[in-house]
């Protein structure tokens, strides 16, 4: 399997939550809890939005992310096709 084809669970999970606008609860290592929608993420941070408030949270401070609905991660080819359908439907 080529390096580019490796299954990256964290990125695919966060991207699924972002694309499908699934609300999440985020628990931090200090016990603080917040909830909202993931707007963006990179290697080190997650941008969480709740109402008109944004929080840039460092990943090393996150203990757990709990989505409000079940997340089914599919093989990459199926997921890419589904995301393309979602994008087409949003444009309609």
From Swiss-Prot:
Gene3D superfamilies: 2.30.30.100. GO terms for cellular component: cytosol. Belongs to the Hfq family. Homohexamer. This is RNA-binding protein Hfq. Keywords: RNA-binding, Stress response. Residues 11-71 form the Sm domain. One of its GO terms (biological process) is regulation of translation, ncRNA-mediated. One of its GO terms (molecular function) is RNA binding. It comes from Thermotoga maritima (strain ATCC 43589 / DSM 3109 / JCM 10099 / NBRC 100826 / MSB8). NCBIfam families: Hfq, PRK00395.1. RNA chaperone that binds small regulatory RNA (sRNAs) and mRNAs to facilitate mRNA translational regulation in response to envelope stress, environmental stress and changes in metabolite concentrations. Also binds with high specificity to tRNAs. The gene is hfq.
């Amino acid at each position: 399997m080529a390096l580019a084809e490796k299954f990256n669970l964290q990125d695919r999970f966060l991207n699924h939550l972002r694309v499908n606008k699934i609300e999440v609860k985020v628990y931090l290592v200090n016990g603080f809890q917040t909830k909202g929608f993931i707007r963006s993420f990179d290697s080190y941070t997650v941008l969480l939005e709740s109402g008109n408030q944004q929080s840039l949270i460092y990943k090393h401070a996150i203990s757990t992310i709990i989505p409000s609905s079940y997340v089914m991660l599919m093989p990459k080819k199926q997921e890419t096709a589904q995301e393309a359908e979602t994008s087409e439907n949003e444009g309609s």
